[in-house]
Amino acid sequence: MSVDLKQQLELADYLGALAVWCIFFGVLFILSVIFNFVCIKKDDDVTALERWGYKKNIDMKLGPHRRSMVARQIPQTVVADH
């Protein structure tokens, strides 16, 4: 009596790991947005998630601050001509 220890992996087996990865980071993103609205007050500094959303021009509010307030708190880069 012999036991075959070789595994036969199919495409669905590999897609399972991808699905778990997507679900994990999706839940992490949703929780971070929820925490931004619950734990950050309007008079606090702009969060990194809000800065990222502003720089990527995402039409979604990622925190309690308005886009104009985020724009004021992001340092503007000045390009100097030589």
Swiss-Prot record:
Organism superkingdom: Eukaryota
Q: Which UniProt keywords apply?
A: Cleavage on pair of basic residues, Signal
Q: Name one Pfam family in it.
A: Nlp36
Protein's name in the database = Neuropeptide-like peptide 36
Q: Which organism is it from?
A: Caenorhabditis elegans
Q: Give the source lineage, highest ranks first.
A: Eukaryota, Metazoa, Ecdysozoa, Nematoda, Chromadorea
